[in-house]
Amino acid sequence: MDQREAAGGAGSIADVLAEYPVIDLTVTNGERWPCWWPMQMPFQQKVWNWFAESGAPAPVHAYMGPVQVRWITLDDHCGIHVDAPSHFVPPADSGLPHAGLLGRQTGVQISLTDLMGPAAVVDVTELIGAGGPGVSPWITPDHLRAWEARQGPLRSGEIVLLHTGWDRYYQPWPAGRAYAFDPVVTRAGPGWPAPRAAAIDYMRGRGITTLGIDAPSIGAAHDALSPHYTGLEHGMRYVENLSGLDQLAPRGAYFIFLPLKVEGASGCPGRAIGMRRRRA
């Protein structure tokens, strides 16, 4: 592609972007937001350098000149992120349960092509509120079959996005307790809808490699393990903490997730977008 085509020639990238506007599917990371898993490293953001020593917000640890610089602390499953197999699969030579060759596959080894593709947006919002205190309602193969009866079979290479509607609870504290803290820690609130292991097997049988959800985890509030093992042991990729899936049609959008490239990461935060054809 020459410079004229890239800038705006017929069939150029600019033409595609004009036809397919970008939709941000990413939650906000911040100290007031429920962007980290309860009981894990909380997200922190601090000022390292301010423009001038006079009137500087605290804490300021350096004076480097007339610039603002901040530092952040986050674990590798903070905010929207992709789970690598090594998140739940130990190395094959560890002697631990569920150990396997994929236990050495970290976030940087996930191919970017696995994290972009046509989206199949499965609406399961009817399950909101169906769980008990600390318990998630299950997304089952029957939910997937019902969607396929309306939209056609899931296709190999599609990225399945489970639209639970749970992102409505992604709010600043204290309202944000309902997102993950109350379902997991206090057990005072219901859990988010989560796919049963059989549903993950069903999708894998359809050729699905990448699965996303607009909730804190693919795992359930009461069972984080079995949904993770079922997919990650077979090289599936899980994108968690999506938002705004209601802006995408069941089919017709293109999904892209670009993770940070962090050596040895068991998961990689990043930015997710959907590209939806502009309506006439």
Model-predicted segments: where are they?
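Active-/binding-site microenvironments in catalytic and ligand-binding cores
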Residues: M1-A280
